[in-house]
From Swiss-Prot:
Protein name per the record: Putative HPr kinase/phosphorylase 2
Record has Lyase as a keyword: no
Gene source species: Oceanobacillus iheyensis (strain DSM 14371 / CIP 107618 / JCM 11309 / KCTC 3954 / HTE831)
InterPro entries (alphabetical): HPr(Ser)_kin/Pase, Hpr_kin/Pase_C, Hpr_kin/Pase_Hpr_N, P-loop_NTPase, Ser_kin/Pase_Hpr-like_N_sf, Sigma_54_int_dom_ATP-bd_1
Domain notes: The Walker A ATP-binding motif also binds Pi and PPi.
Catalytic activity: [HPr protein]-L-serine + ATP = [HPr protein]-O-phospho-L-serine + ADP + H(+); [HPr protein]-O-phospho-L-serine + phosphate + H(+) = [HPr protein]-L-serine + diphosphate
Cystine bridges: none
Membrane-spanning ranges: none
Quaternary data: Homohexamer.
Amino acid sequence: MKSIQVQQLVEEFNLEVLAGEDHRERTITKSRTHRPGLEFIGYFDFFPMERVQILGKKEINYLHQLNEQERDIRIGNVVNYHPPCFIVTSDQDGLTYLKKYCHAEQIPLLRTKEATVDFMAKVDHYLTRKLAPEIAVHGVCMNVLGIGILIRGESGVGKSELAHTLLGRGHRLVADDIVVLKRLSHKTILGTHNDKNKEFLALRSVGLLNVVRAYGSRAFQDETRISLDIKLSKWEKDSLHNELEFETQYRDYMGVSVPSIEIQLQPGRDVAGLIEAAANNWYLQQQGYSAAEDFMNRIEWQDGDD
């Protein structure tokens, strides 16, 4: 199971540490945050104690209104579950009683100036990406016409050279050689780099190329949702490819099915143009249009007239 430390949240969101400063190595394993409103009134049946606990104005105002004895009971009941950390939003103060309990139980108490809803959305987004299951695959990841494409193929087939051609046509590189795939949901795969290969494209006979330095910041994109899987293969004379085939092929990545096509390479073929055509065709299919079905309907209609 993937995890991050509370300290990484502190650094990412510039959080103020109010208590538990020596325990920021506590681990976070869940990608969603939680506001413990029901728990403060004593309902713990579905308390997700493994999540980061967010205390907004509603929670803090409720605690302020309680008498000291009742407040100690309510806070103690929640803190005793030992969540990874508590984060107070909207720069709220008057938190002496929270500091006392968090210090005693060695739980970091943090604070941000941001509003609750906006802050939770940012933290959820960050944790989802950090804690998502991931694999590394050999290939190139590009954003073509706003569509994330994973390009695969044997070593030396020309993936990086193709990526360079696509860059020249105004598209964006995400990762070359090693592509990190993250499963964000049951139907979403995110493609990104591994930090080491960020912005770099390896071209045979040329060497490493920093695409941002060479072509500007618009040549690079940090991540993209993978919508198409394209395999480059060597030309096979006797292979059969039916342009009128209706059935879409898929490739599985961590339980997510991604539409997949194969492009056979041959001298003189405009492979970059075929990639653009595949991206455009995928977009039309998402709008409910199939060129193959449209063509066959026309044939049937004309045959019926005859």
